[in-house]
UniProtKB/Swiss-Prot annotation:
One of its GO terms (biological process) is rRNA processing. Zn(2+) binds at residues 114, 118, 124. Keywords: Cytoplasm, Endonuclease, Hydrolase, Metal-binding, Nuclease, Ribosome biogenesis, rRNA processing, Zinc. This is Endoribonuclease YbeY. It comes from Edwardsiella ictaluri (strain 93-146).
Amino acid sequence: MSNIILDLQLACADLQGLPAEGDFLRWLEAVLPRFRDEAEVTIRLVDEAESHELNLTYRGKDRPTNVLSFPFEAPPGIELPLLGDMVICRQVVEREAQEQNISQLSHWAHMVVHGSLHLLGYDHISDEEAEEMESLEAEIMQVLGYPDPYAAEKESD
C-alpha cells in the first residue's frame, strides 16, 4: 500500500489524452519512497497561460515552462507529510516530446520524476548538481521502463 497522497488538479482546457491519475501516482511511487516514508503532493496540469504567468512571477522567465516545483516548508518543529506542489504545462510537455521524438507518456513521466526530485531538494544549477540529479532521473526512468531522458545529450558529449 502506498503512503503517497496525490491531489491531481486538471486545469487544462482540453483534458483528452492526458495520462491517467494512476500513471501520475505510479511515477511518484518510483521516486518518493526512496526518500520519504509518506508524502502528500499536488500536481496541477495547466495550459500555457498559467505556466507562463507562474514562470514569470516565480522565476523571472517570460515564457511557459514544462514543470515548476514548489516545495512545502513546514515551520520549525512541525512534521508534516506535505512535500509540495508541481505545476506541469500540457502544451510544453507535448511539444517537447514531439521535438525530441520521444513518447508523450515517457516525457510526462520524466517531468513528474524531475519535479519530484526538485520537491525533495535536488537541483541542477551547478554541473555537479545537474550530474547527480540527471543520474537519479535516468535510473528512476529505467525502473519505470522508460529510456534515459538524457541519452541523446550523453551521446553528443
